C-alpha cells in the first residue's frame, strides 16, 4: 500500500509539472518539484528534519511517507509550532521551538538523517519582519550535511523576491559554489522562488 501511494502521488505531481508554467503558478510548481523529490527519496523507516516547519504543510506531506520513521521539526516562532501541531495527524514527530542552526547539537544524529527540508523566508500569514537569515541558514546547512546519511539529501526552497531573501540567495549560492548541488528553476524571472538540492555521497 505504501508503494502504491507513492506511485499515485508521483503521477499526480508529474501531471502538474507537465502543465505550462506561468509565474503565477510558479510557487505551486516548485512545491510540486519538492514533493516529487521527497517521494522519490523517502522510505518508511527514514529520519527526516523539517528545518523550517512554518505552518506544517511540508511535515504533513512527509509524515505519511515515513510511518516507521520520525520527523524532527524546527522553528523559532511558537505560532509555527502551534499551527503545525494543529494539522498533523501522525504522532511520530518531535517539534523544537528553536532555530535550525541548533539542530546538530540538539539531535546528535550524525549520519542518520535521510532528508532535510528548508523552506526559507517568512511564516505565511504572520509577521513578515521575522524571516530566515543567511548566517543561521548556512550554519544549518553545514550541520545538516553532517547529519545526513551517506545517501541523504537536502532540499532548500529560496525566495529572492524580497531584500533579505535576495541576500540569503546570494550568500547560500556563494557558500555552495564548490559543493555538489543542483538548482531547479522554471522561469527566467530572477525574483521567482527556486529549489536547491544537495546530495551526500
Predicted segments, located by residue:
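Conserved SAM-binding loop of SAM-dependent methyltransferases across substrates and taxa
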Residues: 55-67
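Mobile active-site "lid"/loop adjacent to the S-adenosyl-L-methionine
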Residues: 121-140
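Conserved class I S-adenosyl-L-methionine
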Residues: 45-54
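S-adenosyl-L-methionine
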Residues: 2-46, 82-109
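Conserved beta-strand signature within the Rossmann-like core of class I S-adenosyl-L-methionine
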Residues: 151-158
Amino acid at each position: 500500500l505504501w508503494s502504491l501511494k507513492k506511485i499515485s502521488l508521483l503521477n499526480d505531481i508529474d501531471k502538474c509539472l507537465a502543465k505550462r508554467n506561468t509565474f503565477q503558478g510558479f510557487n505551486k510548481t516548485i512545491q510540486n518539484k519538492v514533493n516529487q523529490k521527497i517521494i522519490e527519496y523517502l522510505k518508511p523507516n527514514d529520519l527526516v528534519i523539517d528545518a523550517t516547519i512554518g505552518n506544517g504543510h511540508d511535515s504533513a506531506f512527509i509524515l505519511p511517507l515515513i510511518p516507521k520513521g520520525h520527523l524532527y521539526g524546527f522553528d523559532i516562532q511558537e505560532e509555527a509550532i502551534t499551527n503545525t501541531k494543529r494539522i498533523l495527524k501522525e504522532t511520530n514527530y518531535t517539534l523544537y521551538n528553536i532555530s535550525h542552526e541548533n539542530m546538530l547539537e540538539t539531535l546528535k544524529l550524525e549520519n542518520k538523517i535521510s532528508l532535510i527540508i528548508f523552506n526559507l523566508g517568512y511564516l505565511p500569514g504572520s509577521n513578515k519582519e521575522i524571516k530566515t537569515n543567511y548566517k543561521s541558514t548556512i550554519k544549518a546547512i553545514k550541520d545538516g550535511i553532517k547529519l545526513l546519511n551517506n545517501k541523504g539529501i537536502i532540499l532548500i526552497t529560496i525566495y529572492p523576491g524580497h531584500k533579505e531573501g535576495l541576500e540569503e540567495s546570494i550568500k547560500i549560492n556563494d557558500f555552495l559554489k564548490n559543493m555538489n548541488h543542483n538548482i531547479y528553476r522554471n522561469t527566467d524571472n530572477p525574483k521567482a522562488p527556486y529549489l536547491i538540492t544537495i546530495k551526500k555521497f
